[in-house]
Amino acid sequence: MSESETTDEPDSETASSERTGQLESCQRCGREQGLVGKYDIWLCRQCFREISRGMGFRKYS
């Protein structure tokens, strides 16, 4: 066997986080789905909608 064919198996915990790529969660409620990560906000879309005006975002129609 060559070095590239080694049988090292990653830990199941590490493998699951790498598989989904989901490393962040909402800073307010902890939800892991529907995250707004732009500008490193890391809020779920529901929390972002509730507090976005207070953060200085404006809603355009």
Swiss-Prot record:
Its cofactor is Zn(2+). The keyword rRNA-binding applies. Zn(2+) binds at residues 26, 29, 44, 47. Keywords: Metal-binding, Ribonucleoprotein, Ribosomal protein, RNA-binding, rRNA-binding, Zinc. One of its GO terms (biological process) is cytoplasmic translation. Binds 1 zinc ion per subunit. The keyword Cell membrane does not apply. Residues 1-12 have a biased composition (Acidic residues). One of its GO terms (cellular component) is cytosolic small ribosomal subunit. GO terms for molecular function: rRNA binding; structural constituent of ribosome; zinc ion binding. It comes from the Archaea. Residues 1-25 are annotated as: Disordered. Belongs to the universal ribosomal protein uS14 family. Zinc-binding uS14 subfamily. Part of the 30S ribosomal subunit. Binds 16S rRNA, required for the assembly of 30S particles. This is Small ribosomal subunit protein uS14. It comes from Haloarcula marismortui (strain ATCC 43049 / DSM 3752 / JCM 8966 / VKM B-1809) (Halobacterium marismortui).
